[in-house]
């Protein structure tokens, strides 16, 4: 359905078509020339989302996507004739024949898709831009470049933590954000928000929602200061992944620290433990290569042992 492909209008590109000559049955040359056209011609004229199969038309040839046909109760808004019973096969073929690149092609993505389907991929593209969480920094880049950028340009606020062990995460309430780096990989944004009930604390990984990228879990603990015995714990089986930090109050996935837990302290002295859900694709490929090399070494050792045995005989 077209509603699944897009939620907003996009900047369109012009698609070129080749120019060639063919001959008809009588041997005469018939010129067939292609022209440039705007991709928004392949959008539903009603909702302006990308057309995807099934596409319907009325008897007068007006087209609409399936979701619009349902919303309009199968009545064409242009001529009031019934629409939604007959599919526009030729329009479906045109839409499927137009191939477009991923919007992140300039950042390294080489994927191509039928028109409209690239938006579905864009949400999970590992080349989607991520934004630097440092205040007053406008840098954006692919997630791996962002990590090196933060280390080089914001080293004074750089904090590295390891895997599977609790480490200190001391967040100054006035600064609202603490950035941690998980090993040599993802940046973790720990944020606090002052609300009526207390302090909201969130933990997010700055990474695209691509398979094998920034897939982490975490545990967060806060102990009542000044000798208190109370400890708060917050655990998430899967850390949220974001491309850009937001300073709007979260509606879910936060730890609430009541003000009476804070005392007069201006710093949230927490501890955090981060674990990886599964290996990144690149690390998995490296492991496979190392396993293959080990297998080759084992085979060579077996061959050497067989040769030694033959010599002894």
From Swiss-Prot:
Region (Disordered): 1-26, 278-313
Keyword Ubl conjugation (UniProt): no
Zinc finger boundaries on the chain: RING-type: 44-80
Residues given in the record as Zn(2+) 1 binding sites: 102, 109, 121, 125
Secretion signal span: none
Enzyme Commission identifier(s): 2.3.2.27
Matching Pfam families: Sina_RING, Sina_ZnF
Zinc fingers (SIAH-type) by residue: 97-155
Chain segments carrying region SBD: 94-277
Pathway membership, UniProt: Protein modification; protein ubiquitination
Top-level class of the enzyme under EC nomenclature: transferase
Superkingdom to which the source organism belongs: Eukaryota
Residues binding Zn(2+) 2, per UniProt: 132, 137, 149, 154
Biased composition (Acidic residues): 282-313
Keyword Transferase in record: yes
Family, similarity comment: Belongs to the SINA (Seven in absentia) family.
Function according to Swiss-Prot or TrEMBL: E3 ubiquitin-protein ligase that mediates ubiquitination and subsequent proteasomal degradation of target proteins. E3 ubiquitin ligases accept ubiquitin from an E2 ubiquitin-conjugating enzyme in the form of a thioester and then directly transfers the ubiquitin to targeted substrates. It probably triggers the ubiquitin-mediated degradation of different substrates.
Entry text on domains: The RING-type zinc finger domain is essential for ubiquitin ligase activity. The SBD domain (substrate-binding domain) mediates the homodimerization and the interaction with substrate proteins. It is related to the TRAF family.
Protein name: E3 ubiquitin-protein ligase SINA-like 2
Species the sequence originates in: Arabidopsis thaliana (Mouse-ear cress)
